[in-house]
């Protein structure tokens, strides 16, 4: 499986056994000015997350794209 990986947001081949792509997002102290923090990567299973953290998992190549928001 190929997934987008942060910090470079490049498509990379996942290690053997890691066939799930994920997009994890959450707010930090800069959320109001910068938006949510985003973490992209590969996993063997969909990661469990703490309350307040959003996770989306998928299992096809490059199914976790992220387009950075534009500053005005």
Swiss-Prot record:
**What GO CC terms are in its UniProt record?**
extracellular region
User: Where does the record locate the signal sequence feature?
Assistant: none
Is-annotated flag, keyword Transmembrane? no
Which keywords label this protein?
A: Acetylcholine receptor inhibiting toxin, Disulfide bond, Ion channel impairing toxin, Neurotoxin, Postsynaptic neurotoxin, Secreted, Toxin
Where is it localised?
A: Secreted
Tissues expressing the protein: Expressed by the venom gland.
Please give the positions of the paired cysteines in each disulfide bond: 3-21, 14-42, 27-31, 46-57, 58-63
GO molecular function list: acetylcholine receptor inhibitor activity; ion channel regulator activity; toxin activity
The record's InterPro entries line, in alphabetical order, gives: Snake_3FTx, Snake_toxin-like_sf, Snake_toxin_con_site, Toxin_cobra-type
Alphabetized Gene3D superfamilies for the sequence: CD59
Main localisation: secreted
The keyword Membrane is assigned to this record: no
Q: Which protein family is it in? A: Belongs to the three-finger toxin family. Long-chain subfamily. Type II alpha-neurotoxin sub-subfamily.
The record describes the protein's role as:
Binds with high affinity to muscular (alpha-1/CHRNA1) and neuronal (alpha-7/CHRNA7) nicotinic acetylcholine receptor (nAChR) and inhibits acetylcholine from binding to the receptor, thereby impairing neuromuscular and neuronal transmission.
- What is the protein's given name? Long neurotoxin OH-17
Which species does this protein come from? Ophiophagus hannah
